[in-house]
Amino acid sequence: MRELQSIIDGGNPYTEQLLNAWRKQLDDFNAGAAVCPLPNFRMDDDEEWIDEYQRKYEKKGRGLHFELLPDPFRGDPRAPVWILLLNPGYSEVDRYDHLGLCPLCGERLVRADRKTTSHENGCAARFFGSGLPDASAALKSRQDMLIEELKLDLSTPRKFLWIEPDFHTVPEENVTLAGKGGSLWWKEFLFGDGDSDGYLLPSCGIKQPDIAIGKRLFALESFPYHSKKFDSSFLQNEKFCHSDYFKFWCFLVGWAVESGRKIIVRYEAIRKVLERMIGKSAYANNKGNIISMASINPSLTIGNLCGKNCRANSMELVESLREVLSGRE
């Protein structure tokens, strides 16, 4: 079995050179005029299949948002439990978290070295309930953390960024104005409205925010770009399957299977990709480590892991998840 570090060093498509170029895009945008081109964070080798995807799905409300940094990794891949998801979501709140753009009007709320206008302060008061909750330094800090997350650097502590306080920028009572951002989505997915015992992590003693989450759980998106909705059938697209990102995804997931990680599969489309990738026989032999979530409820609850669509032995699998998450194994 290949070492995880070797897989990352040889396969991570988010190279230092690429990330430096993206960081410069962000710096230029932060310092730019009130109206200036948005950053464009697409991989060069993705152009062909991106064009195909956008032609088929953009007008159906499933277009990709390249102004936001790809966000496929959360937590530490050495964690005992992995969860495979579809792709990073999108709302106008994410544009604020990534770029400092107003979730309501789309104009700049945060830029380097300048005061906000009365119009911008009006939007801020309406959306945040007061003036701007942070400044350009806080925006740059979030951007830096998102860039660092793409490196998958195992020599530094790996956090679950979207439940970190730095990413909780919007009062929850105001999310109806512009949709849920990544922070609220992940908190609801992992913990619900609070630390309910009906959710897997709280039942293991993991509360929010807790550094143990990044050490115990690794989340991996099957597709790296943001969209409000995503057509999962595109995971079968031949051009996408030859992309650098998907090849890296396969190497990572292959390592997780071989090393005996517990793997939670979020969607049936991902389960089919996983089964095709490792083969039906190997998939069957690893059923003790793979559990599919019921598709009805989007939250990481024990009930969703033991839903009527899951296997009869799902409660046994959930208990094994709880053992490794709580460190009892």
Model-predicted segments: where are they?
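Charged, often glycine-rich, active-site loop that binds/positions anionic groups
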Residues: 45-62, 212-245
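C-terminal capping/extension of enzyme domains
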Residues: 1-38, 161, 168-179, 230-257, ...
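Short, solvent-exposed loop/turn segments at secondary-structure junctions
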Residues: 87-91, 223-227, 268-273, 298
